[in-house]
Amino acid sequence: MAEAISAALPTRDQVVPSRKRVKLPPWLEVAKPRLIPLLLATTLGGMALTEGWPLSSPRLVCTLGGGALASAAAGVLNCLWEQDLDGRMARTSGRALPSGRLSPTSAFIGAIACTLAAAMLLVSGVNCLAAGLSLLGLCSYVLLYTALLKPRTTQNIVIGGVAGAIPPLVGAAAATGHVGLGGWWLFALVMVWTPAHFWALALLLREDYRAVGIPMLPVVKGPVVTARAIRRYGWATVLLSGFGVLALPTGGVFYGLILLPFNGRLIQMVQRLSMDPDSLMAAKGLFRWSILYLFGICLLLILSRTDLASSFDQQVMFVLQQLPIV
């Protein structure tokens, strides 16, 4: 009976990716390189929210390079910690460590090398605050989320999401040597964005998580409760994103106007899932859009710091000043 039920369930390859995945070398696979671009995008977003934008090319390269290395180290340590768990899940049993294509010793050496390289690059090429925050992000992902929260509570991603929200702080620290209100705003935005994004994926993979006893919200509470929680966090993301108008040093009006269709689409996807919590297509659509949404927000923050956006803001303010006061 269990085998029949398992056979009837959709696989991850059927519901998540839109195209065939590229086969990566084992040493690169464990670094989880597909997660790195979004982390670097939020790092750039944190930079764009400061008066230090744009950064000099050497500092920019050191910040992004150090962030990528720290993220890679975190990915490898996560794979090391979860190799037994991955080996028991059909979806992940073919990964480099549980399949034996890469030895744990080699992976651990790689993680240490990436960590040291990240620290050296950030300390020497950026500043100690940026380096410390990057290492804090690494530790919070491996120790707080992976080791402590993930196997114990349905709120694992709510609290553990702090790891993914640290890159904006790194970006702000790299640009100015401190973290201002703009950096903390983007940190908070990523924190409230994360649950809706991750729970959409967890809805697709809930039977995998159930099989190995990981208490993800869809496993413990079911799709209906999960969809309601996603709706709450989706609306919180939309509301908080609007404060970027105030967080930006320049270009806030431009940001606010271009933000509207992004938020409209996010709410549309959230509502669609809320109306049909069992729909894998709705969960899949929300998961994909949430990634594009955060990429779009970070790109919008950067564009808002251009001379064109500043000029647009000035023209809008001039027009508003000419309106008669009733």
From Swiss-Prot:
It is a multi-pass membrane protein. Pathway: Porphyrin-containing compound metabolism; heme O biosynthesis; heme O from protoheme: step 1/1. It is an enzyme of class 2 (transferase). GO terms for biological process: heme O biosynthetic process. InterPro entries: Protohaem_IX_farnesylTrfase, UbiA_prenyltransferase, UbiA_prenylTrfase_CS, UbiA_sf. It is found in: Cell inner membrane. One of its GO terms (cellular component) is plasma membrane. The chain crosses the membrane at residues 35-55, 60-80, 106-126, 129-149, 157-177, 185-205, 242-262, 283-303. The keyword Secreted does not apply. It catalyses: heme b + (2E,6E)-farnesyl diphosphate + H2O = Fe(II)-heme o + diphosphate. One of its GO terms (molecular function) is protoheme IX farnesyltransferase activity. Coiled coil: none annotated. Keywords: Cell inner membrane, Cell membrane, Heme biosynthesis, Membrane, Transferase, Transmembrane, Transmembrane helix. Its EC number is 2.5.1.141. Its main location: membrane. It holds the Pfam family UbiA. Converts heme B (protoheme IX) to heme O by substitution of the vinyl group on carbon 2 of heme B porphyrin ring with a hydroxyethyl farnesyl side group. Belongs to the UbiA prenyltransferase family. Protoheme IX farnesyltransferase subfamily. Carbon 2 of the heme B porphyrin ring is defined according to the Fischer nomenclature. This is Protoheme IX farnesyltransferase. It comes from Parasynechococcus marenigrum (strain WH8102). The gene is ctaB.
